[in-house]
From Swiss-Prot:
Domain Helicase C-terminal, residue spans: 305-473
A Pfam family this chain is assigned to: DEAD
Function, as annotated: ATP-dependent RNA helicase involved in mRNA export from the nucleus. Rather than unwinding RNA duplexes, DDX19 functions as a remodeler of ribonucleoprotein particles, whereby proteins bound to nuclear mRNA are dissociated and replaced by cytoplasmic mRNA binding proteins.
Protein name according to UniProt: ATP-dependent RNA helicase DDX19A
Start and end residues of each stretch annotated as N-terminal lobe: 2-299
Gene that this sequence comes from: DDX19A
Class in the EC hierarchy, top level: hydrolase
Length: 478
């Protein structure tokens, strides 16, 4: 496999991990029927806020479903610890002066050159003396392989004790990182890797001889302090991956800070996060002293290419009839329909299936592998309608999605408009430079108020659509 895309190849390697049998979000089993509708045994009424996906599962889902490199045209912003020092970037791996075995491992994985963000990040991560780094890197930019390369570069194989420590929010994400280490380090057979995760039992008093330890914060903290399997004073590189996921998990933030405080002052600290909201930034500053900072400026999602409409209804059945009228009047390549609860989504998927539509259902009670399979089938066009809750409002790029329907408008836990979710939902259409269409179902004074506030927030007019008038529906498709 030869490719110019370092990050794409990394992600293909990561997505190739098959040992995902433990990725249960809930114990409940969900199976698609012959029509592609996924029917659940129990559909408890859950609010959108409760349905918002656990970040760790979402991160893992992104790794499994991504078949293309995230658009890498965005600008990289570099803030150096010492603004007077020269800013180095590289266009080839040879410039990094890697150990021959590591360079061989990089090429064996199919990489020809660094991606845009690594051009700046790798020289900092491999510099002497070591430099600390905080990097914003969304899923798909190849950051896992970048920090793996940094760890492997620092290890002295002859020293039989842990020298690099990597924290991941979950066992499954730690496993993804471990696979990349094994692949990149395969020409370094003397390099050893250990997983500090719950269930990995060691004898009390035992010392670990592996060079790199990957694990979850709670277990790593136990291994460093209570059980003393690891001598934290000998750690050279400390990586904190998925920081935004980490701080969303109760206890992980405090545990990570406690681990960091045990490390020597000259330990290299590397922190990665997909987002840089205030809570993540405060956390990063606590664990990474005197950092260089790299931010990948993200393309703003826009509503400019999306025509927005609303339909007035009095009940759930009227909303369904309006939906049927839209389908009867215009040709829809593929559509995504968002619901407020799992119960509504399950009902709607079944009703659409009865009408002869090829329907798939996606919700948070499914295991991650099932979700990835449903999304892939939708991407391939095997189902034309995807009914979902907020579980996949982000990150799914399907070129054929021409219509997004908000069967229920997105609100937060206090009943206020969730403008960000609205943007991400209808942003699934109008992509790749094409015109998109968004239809919002309004069934009460409250939801009309929500719609008006969304309209004011984005300063974009949302037109009324009469779905009883077929001529009017036909016009919106032009």
């Amino acid at each position: 496999m030869a490719t110019d895309s370092w990050a794409l190849a990394v992600d293909e390697q990561e997505a190739a991990v098959k040992s995902m049998s433990n990725l249960q979000i809930k114990e409940e089993k969900v199976k698609p029927d012959t029509n592609g509708v996924i029917k659940t045994n129990a559909t408890p009424e859950k609010t959108d806020e409760e349905e918002k996906e656990d970040r760790a599962a979402q991160s893992l889902l992104n790794k499994l479903i991504r078949s293309n490199l995230v658009d890498n045209t965005n600008q990289v912003e570099v803030l150096q610890r010492d603004p007077n020092s020269p800013l180095y970037s590289v266009k080839s791996f040879e410039e990094l002066r890697l150990k021959p075995q590591l360079l061989q491992g990089v090429y064996a994985m199919g990489f020809n050159r660094p991606s845009k963000i690594q051009e700046n990040a790798l020289p900092m991560m491999l510099a002497e003396p070591p430099q600390n780094l905080i990097a914003q890197s969304q899923s798909g930019t190849g950051k896992t392989a970048a920090f793996v390369l940094a760890m492997l570069s620092r290890v002295e194989p002859a020293e039989r004790y842990p020298q690099c420590l990597c924290l991941s929010p979950t066992y499954e994400l730690a496993l993804q990182t471990g696979k990349v280490i094994e692949q990149m380090g395969k020409f370094h057979p003397e390099l050893k890797l250990a997983y500090a995760v719950r269930g990995n039992k060691l004898e009390r008093g035992q010392k670990i001889s592996e060079h790199i330890v990957i694990g979850t914060p709670g277990t790593v903290l136990d291994w460093c302090s209570k059980l003393k399997f690891i001598d934290p004073k000998k750690i050279k590189v400390f990586v904190l991956d998925e920081a935004d996921v980490m701080i969303a998990t109760q206890g992980h933030q405090d545990q990570s800070i406690r681990i960091q405080r045990m490390l020597p002052r000259n330990c290299q600290m590397l922190l990665f996060s997909a987002t840089f909201e205030d809570s993540v930034w405060k956390f990063a500053q606590k664990v990474v002293p005197d950092p260089n900072i790299i931010k990948l400026k993200r393309e703003e999602e826009t509503l400019d290419t999306i025509k927005q409409y609303y339909v007035l209804c009095n009940s759930r059945d009227e909303k369904f009839q309006a939906l049927c009228n839209i389908y009867g009047a215009i040709t829809i390549a593929q559509a995504m329909i968002f619901c407020h609860t799992r119960k509504t989504a399950s009902w709607l998927a079944a009703e659409l299936s009865k009408e002869g539509h090829q329907v798939a259902l996606l919700s948070g009670e499914m295991v991650v592998e099932q979700r990835a399979a449903v999304i892939e089938r939708f991407r391939e066009g095997k189902e034309k309608v995807l009914v979902t809750t907020n579980v996949c409002a982000r990150g799914i790029d399907v070129e054929q999605v021409s219509v997004v329907i908000n069967f229920d408008l997105p609100v937060d836990k206090d009943g206020n408009p969730d403008n960000e979710t609205y943007l991400h939902r209808i942003g699934r259409t109008g992509r790749f430079g094409k015109r998109g269409l968004a239809v919002n179902m309004v069934d009460s004074k409250h939801s009309m108020n929500i719609l008006n506030r969304i309209q004011e927030h984005f300063n974009k007019k949302i037109e009324r659509l009469d779905t009883d008038d077929l001529d009017e529906i036909e016009k919106i498709a032009n």
